[in-house]
């Protein structure tokens, strides 16, 4: 079976990303508005300044899921990835 890896785009400026078990949970003003299984994701792109829980960052780093933060207008702020595997000196 072929594994399709998807990217989660969070475009709401007031959204906060958290971890519940093996799920990414999107909160907006302390209300849950979405839930996605972590094993289906290759990357998460967040537009806005609210942030992500440290538990979700750690889980994404362990599973090699990239987190990318952009301003509400789309300007790049930061990218977080997991450990590099293999020979990095090449």
Language model features by range: what are they?
Residues 1-90:
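N-terminal intrinsically disordered, cationic/polar leader segments
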